[in-house]
Amino acid sequence: MEKLILRRVDRQNEEMILNFGPQHPSTHGVINFLVETDGEVLKRATPDVGYLHRSIEKIGEMVGYPGFMPYTDRVDYVAAMFANEGYAIAVERLLKIEVPQRAQWLRAISCELCRIASHLVSVGTMVMDIGAFTPMLHGIRERETINDLLEALCGARLTYNYHRIGGVAFDLPEGWRDKVLHFLDHFDKFLAEFDRLISFNEIYVKRLANVAVIPGPMAINYGLVGPNLRGSGVDWDVRRDLPYGAYPNFKFDVPVGKGFFGTSGDSFDRYYVRCLEMAESSKIVRQALDSLPEGEITAKVPRNIKPEAGEAIGRVESARGELAYYVISDGTNKAYRVRARTGSFTAMCIIEDISRGLMVADLVALISSLDVVAPEIDR
């Protein structure tokens, strides 16, 4: 990205240079954009990140392997389960540990519920950013029910620390399965209602269709992942194409953008792919609960973890796409190197190219459609 040089502008025209953030409600975290406009048209929008940098990768090299697990929750506090699982898989591969089947199923259940909760925040805040406040409250209402379920499962509502090296921390509490199924019965009806009221609303469609189009090849070149990549028509999902855990045992579809109301890869496609993914997550949770095997929930893991010297990658399909941990062991009880590859950073990189020529109001829609989360950007 080129550096935006601040300069004087002619007062006789409508050019402006302003800061969009870092505390703007539409930036979804402490993110700043240096925005150059000509009237209501964007000439340039340069992301300015780093406001939430906490050296989390370096922390992973300073504490023991189990000690870093609670920090992974902070990589993406909106969908923390996935960051737990990605790191756990990487360390398990270093240790050559086989995770019990029941633990793999519990991981899938918790992650898919977390995916639904994250997507509810994404689609709800997207509608709110465009100007409709009430639908966001509908999404938060459903998310609160999921938070209650996850709190009953692991004792926390946002930063779960549920996945552990070798398995999971807790088994299902009594009656939890029935509560989840009852919620899913209601949630499937909620999705249909949300589509009717919001997704297919004429005003909403006009605000998103054909806006901020990202063609498939461009999405690949920028390294987009998850719903942002699939929204551009690229059929790629780590759960299916690089299967891990219990996912090979479940049947589910991978929604991709098809130009539902406009052009493939526009803001509406990115939005609606997330809506369709919530329905698929509901299917996966039902299958996992129906086929949940008996057995242990954690493998035998040494108290003092010292993997042999080597390297491993743990990748999962998070709510924001492929989340990968690259961990290097030097044979001690602390990692030599921990690297997290997240989807939000690459999504930020594409904004400058895509935003040129948009209206200022459409920049808000573009940021929302990419579903960036600040701690995933600043690591």
From Swiss-Prot:
Superkingdom as given in the UniProt entry: Bacteria
Gene Ontology, cellular component aspect: plasma membrane
UniProt EC number: 7.1.1.-
Entry's localization field: Cell inner membrane
Role summary: NDH-1 shuttles electrons from NADH, via FMN and iron-sulfur (Fe-S) centers, to quinones in the respiratory chain. The immediate electron acceptor for the enzyme in this species is believed to be ubiquinone. Couples the redox reaction to proton translocation (for every two electrons transferred, four hydrogen ions are translocated across the cytoplasmic membrane), and thus conserves the redox energy in a proton gradient.
Oligomeric and partner information: NDH-1 is composed of 14 different subunits. Subunits NuoB, C, D, E, F, and G constitute the peripheral sector of the complex.
Protein name: NADH-quinone oxidoreductase subunit D 1
